[in-house]
């Protein structure tokens, strides 16, 4: 009897401990750029890697070198910037080919090492036809116009198909977004085993874009949130609420973000969504507008969500 009681007590104690423990972070995120315009030294780019590795994929690449230098200044990296660029960054996922998302990739390509660039077909075609075309810039890819130098392998992504990210232990799955309909942007679901991060490129709300892209995305990722496998969502908010819908240009405001989070919560439940970190990207200067966005998102909301504002060069764990 004592032996049985002892086993029961041990089970209860281990259960209490396990429920009291917070889930260990799985991913590290290093923002190389967090803004959506004006400052060419700080444009959208986020390094993601499993914790304990140097297997980074760069999600968008508006700023690369300046962001690496800032990360070194902040103590995130203790190696030369060339080591981060050439050895740590294993590939790039480009959500769309607007310059504030690809300029760092283009400018740094002569100094970069061989790796893969992932993008959906419209973004890939734009990069091949307008940037890496031997006229605007040398063709550092392995296909396209001019004489391909074959430094980068251009990998065109198909929606709903998961593929491995070369030289990492992660995978990527692309989902369509609307960035002034019919122009397409992309969301990337990055996975490591049963854990994931969701990164959204530029997107307008479904109500303005007249699509169901975001609703479809929320439905697809809801099971991951319910199982606490989705560690974070990186999503843009470009303008404060005062920006008229007619002048959103395929972007979100705090009120539109909250409407989209309501849709997501309908699939996941409020409590499950509260456990998933929401990281705000693509804030557009000037500083007064950014401050207003932060104030509007800091206001209490009926979902109980807390938003995270990344800082260039400062490492985060998810």
Which residues are covered by each model-predicted region?
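Active-site HxH/HxHxD metal-binding segment of metal-dependent hydrolases
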Residues: 79-148
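Divalent metal-coordination and catalytic microenvironments
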Residues: 29, 46, 60, 96, ...
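Active-site neighborhood of phospho(di)ester-bond hydrolases with catalytic His/Asp-centered motifs
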Residues: 58-62, 88-100, 118-120, 199-202, ...
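Pre-active-site segment of Zn-dependent metallo-hydrolases
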Residues: 38-93, 103-110, 209, 213-221
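Cap/insert and terminal regions of metallo-dependent hydrolase folds
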Residues: 206-311
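Catalytic core of the metallo-beta-lactamase
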Residues: 45, 49, 156-226
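Zn-dependent metallo-beta-lactamase
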Residues: 2, 9, 16-56, 63-65
């Amino acid at each position: 009897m004592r032996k049985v009681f002892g086993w029961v007590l041990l089970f209860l104690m281990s259960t209490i401990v396990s429920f009291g423990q917070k889930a260990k972070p799985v991913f590290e995120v290093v923002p190389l750029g967090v803004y959506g315009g004006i400052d060419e030294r700080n444009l959208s780019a986020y390094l993601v890697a499993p914790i304990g590795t140097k297997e980074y994929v760069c999600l968008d690449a508006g700023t690369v070198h300046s962001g690496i230098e800032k990360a070194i200044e902040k103590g995130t990296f203790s190696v030369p910037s060339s080591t981060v660029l050439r050895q740590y960054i294993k590939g790039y996922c480009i959500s769309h080919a607007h310059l504030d998302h690809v300029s760092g990739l283009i400018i740094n390509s002569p100094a970069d090492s061989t790796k893969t660039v992932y993008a959906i077909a419209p973004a890939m075609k734009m990069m091949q036809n307008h940037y890496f075309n031997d006229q605007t810039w040398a063709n550092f890819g392995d296909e396209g116009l001019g004489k391909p130098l074959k430094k980068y392998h251009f990998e065109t992504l198909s929606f709903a198909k998961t593929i491995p990210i070369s030289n990492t232990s992660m995978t990527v799955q692309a989902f369509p977004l609307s960035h002034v309909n019919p122009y397409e942007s992309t969301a990337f679901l990055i996975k490591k085993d049963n854990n994931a991060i969701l990164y959204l490129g530029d997107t307008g709300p479904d109500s303005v874009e007249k699509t169901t892209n975001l609703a479809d995305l929320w439905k697809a990722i809801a099971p991951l949130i319910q199982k606490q496998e989705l560690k974070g969502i990186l999503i843009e908010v470009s303008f404060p609420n005062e920006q008229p819908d007619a002048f959103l240009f395929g972007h979100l405001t705090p009120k539109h973000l909250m409407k989209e989070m309501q849709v997501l919560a309908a699939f996941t439940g409020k409590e499950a969504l509260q456990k998933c970190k929401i990281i705000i990207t693509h804030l557009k200067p000037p500083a007064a507008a950014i401050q207003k966005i932060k104030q509007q998102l800091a206001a209490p909301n009926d979902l109980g969500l807390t938003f995270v504002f990344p800082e260039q060069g400062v490492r985060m764990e998810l």
